Amino acid sequence: MLLRFTKMHGLGNDFMVLDLISQHAHVQPKHAKQWGDRHTGVGFDQLLIVEPPSHPDVDFRYRIFNSDGSEVEQCGNGARCFARFVLDKRLTTKKTIRVETKSGVIELRVQNDGQVCVNMGAPRLEPAQVPFQAEQAALTYRVDVEGQSVELAALSMGNPHAVLRVDNVDSAPVHTLGPKLEHHPRFPQRVNVGFLQVLDRKHARLRVWERGAGETQACGTGACAAAVAAIRQGWMDSPVQLELPGGKLSIEWAGEGQPVMMTGPAARVYEGQVRL
């Protein structure tokens, strides 16, 4: 059978979006891996699936697969594209929607200027919630990587993140240290790795090595995690403007126990069909 899909991106973080409300199919990890290949498939960082909700107090269910076939809990840039998609496809007329993910419910709001604001929920800071192996919670942790000691913050935005401060993101070891930390045994579910260069109290640059996808043009949850880490350590003040390779995101966080608000663009690229 043929399935209709939409190719979208949020700051260059690109997605294949499938509506499984008006069309019915059983999509499996092998399909995500097949379609995700940039040479022989559609090519994307993540596959986003729109499904009917399983609870009456939410509008949709949101599932996410990496291009390696692994299903993940959360994707911030994808959430913005999800909100634009369900409006564009007239699956809802609401400008504010509640969406269930593997890690909980998030709220998405499409603004009049076309930007999308996502309530990502409160960050989870306890090591067991990341999950990360540590005896007790701390602002930063020391992790040994092949004899090198690396200082990082570890937290969850519904998915696990490590954040490292660097002097210059252009020369940061994203492609060498990134995969080593992703698969480090202290992160039992693997981890997304952010390399953060603080410019001043309000502005920073960020590159992210994403679990299961490698370096991407932008990572929404990575931007949220980096902002939280920077604010907690006293480096920056909310709201924070983060510049990623694909563009800029605005992140607001009022402190522990409070939700992280992420605002940024979402763009449609093209429509297509793929064989299941």
Swiss-Prot record:
Give residue numbers for the site Important for dimerization: Y270
Q: Which residues bind substrate?
A: N13, Q46, N66, G76, N77, N159, N192, E210, R211, G220, T221
Identify the residue position(s) of the site Could be important to modulate the pK values of the two catalytic cysteine residues. Answer: H161, E210
Key words of the record: Amino-acid biosynthesis, Cytoplasm, Isomerase, Lysine biosynthesis
Read off the Pfam families from this record: DAP_epimerase (PF01678)
**SUPFAM superfamilies registered for this protein in UniProt:** Diaminopimelate epimerase-like
TM ranges are: none
- InterPro entries, A to Z: DAP_epimerase_AS, DAP_epimerase_DapF
Q: Kind of enzyme, top EC level?
A: isomerase
Q: Which BP terms does GO give this entry?
A: lysine biosynthetic process via diaminopimelate
| Family in the record | Belongs to the diaminopimelate epimerase family.
Name the job this protein performs.
Catalyzes the stereoinversion of LL-2,6-diaminopimelate (L,L-DAP) to meso-diaminopimelate (meso-DAP), a precursor of L-lysine and an essential component of the bacterial peptidoglycan.
- Provide the assembly information: Homodimer.
The entry's protein name is Diaminopimelate epimerase
- Biological source species: Ectopseudomonas mendocina (strain ymp) (Pseudomonas mendocina)
